[in-house]
């Protein structure tokens, strides 16, 4: 399996191997990355667990797993981003992301979301990239809006966003 790297101006998104995903899914594993704050954020660990489960279930498709967000300037890992699963039958795919506390407010999440959404929408059959945020997570909502996503609905606890292909 060839692991994908998606490059943006200041960050590189490195697709996790199964071994790295397993290591990150463990409470103290680094996945082989040097983390800015010394440890991976919880959401990245959860996402790597989703990748491990997809491999075990035989549903994993290359490119549609978890990526580590790495700063180009120094190679430090600042967060994770990835897909909840491969695209569905309608061509829709959902993303999730988080960054370490020390990397927040610097535009890394917006850059990573923009890059992974552009990659996804360039894949055959993909029609839309979606994301959900907690209702009270205004920072994450701004990340999605800056990346071109449109708010499409709100429930009692979630805001749903979508970026459609051209």
Regions found by a protein language model. Name each.
Residues 1-94, 99-102, 115-119, 123, ...:
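GNAT-family acyltransferases
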Residues 111-112, 139:
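Charged catalytic carboxylate motif
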Residues 144:
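Conserved active-site tyrosine of GNAT-family acetyltransferases
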Residues 127:
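Short acidic/polar active-site loop segments enriched in Thr and Asp
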Residues 131-141:
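Conserved beta-strand-loop-alpha-helix junction that forms the acyl-donor binding cleft
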Residues 105-110:
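Glycine-rich acyl-CoA binding loop
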């Amino acid at each position: 399996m060839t692991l994908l790297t998606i490059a943006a101006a200041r960050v590189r998104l490195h697709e996790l191997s199964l071994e790295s995903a397993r290591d990150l899914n463990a409470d103290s594993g680094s996945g082989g990355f040097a983390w800015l704050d010394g440890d991976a954020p919880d959401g990245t660990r959860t996402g790597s667990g989703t990748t491990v489960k997809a491999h075990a279930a035989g549903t994993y498709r290359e490119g549609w797993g978890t990526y580590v967000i790495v700063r180009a300037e120094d190679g430090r890992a600042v967060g994770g981003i990835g897909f909840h699963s491969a695209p569905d039958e309608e061509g829709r795919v959902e993303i999730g992301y988080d960054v370490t506390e020390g990397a927040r407010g610097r535009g890394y999440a917006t850059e990573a979301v923009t890059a992974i959404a552009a990659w996804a929408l360039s894949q055959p059959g993909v029609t839309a990239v979606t994301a959900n945020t907690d209702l009270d997570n205004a920072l994450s909502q701004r990340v999605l809006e800056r990346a071109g996503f449109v708010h499409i609905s709100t429930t009692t606890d979630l805001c749903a966003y979508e970026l459609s292909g051209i």
